[in-house]
Amino acid sequence: MLSSLGIVLPAYNEESRLWSALDELFEYLCSAPSGDLPELVSVLVVDDGSTDGTAALVRARPEFAAEGFALSRRDCPKLGLLTVPHGGKGSAVRAGMLVADGDALVFADADMATPPDQLGKLVRALETADVALGSRIQPDGSDMRATQPRFRRLVGRMFRVAAQLWVTGPVKDTQCGFKGFRRAAARDLFGRLRIRSIVFDVDLIYLARRRGYRMAIVPVNWADRRGSRMRARPKLALRVAWDLVRIRFVHRGVKRAPRESAAAE
């Protein structure tokens, strides 16, 4: 098993949901069966320029470590905080994944829509893959409990079809906010990331395919959580469509990674 795990949680105005989500995460980290997760972990909240008390909430946690993002024992985990100007989820995830510590690096939604007990699935997949993509729509093991509005679900399906045809190929669920990377792959891919909107996941997957990284699709459980600010609006739909078109052009010069760096840490 990989010897350490870094967890990145992007957060924007999550004051109302983050405390309970962190309770859930730390409870699992401390109680997970031996062998399910590495014994060394780091947890990093990236505050994406929140205008509420998100950052203050993180600093008030008993696990908060002012010294930064260092690894600690899983039975006594520490919590780090990185504050960045508001740039959207893609920018926040990128900032965290470029500094987080761990042989395996995972980013997850701050509301724990994918429960922490799914972390072990990504870590195990990264034993043989460079990139592990959580999927909510796999017939063999995922459980998606959605209460999203019908229109949002319809837009999501249309987006998945367009992304598959134009960019991601066999990857159906590009937008699951639960993805894992070996450290070398994370530093490479996030360093090259050009799309910072909600389409950043598609950009990552396209880059991973262009760079020749080994990808695993991992069925995970997922439940829609109240409080999401994501709304399907015409202006957003146009931005998404434009970013999908851009992806294949902004990375035209990207070449395959040397095999020794594609998963050899």
Regions found by a protein language model. Name each.
Residues 1-4, 168-169, 192-265:
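Hydrophobic helical membrane-anchoring modules
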Residues 47-56, 112:
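A conserved acidic beta->alpha catalytic loop
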Residues 105:
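Short aromatic/hydrophobic "clamp" motif used to bind/position activated sugar donors
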Residues 3-9, 18, 25, 39-46:
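Hydrophobic targeting segments
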Residues 14-33:
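Short, well-formed alpha-helical segments that are part of the catalytic scaffolds
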Residues 16-20, 52-61:
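Acidic helix N-cap motif at the loop->helix transition within catalytic regions
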Residues 78, 84-99, 116-198, 225-235, ...:
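Acceptor/aglycone-binding surface of glycosyltransferases and processive sugar-polymer synthases
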Residues 33-49, 82:
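Short beta-strand/loop segment that forms part of the nucleotide-sugar
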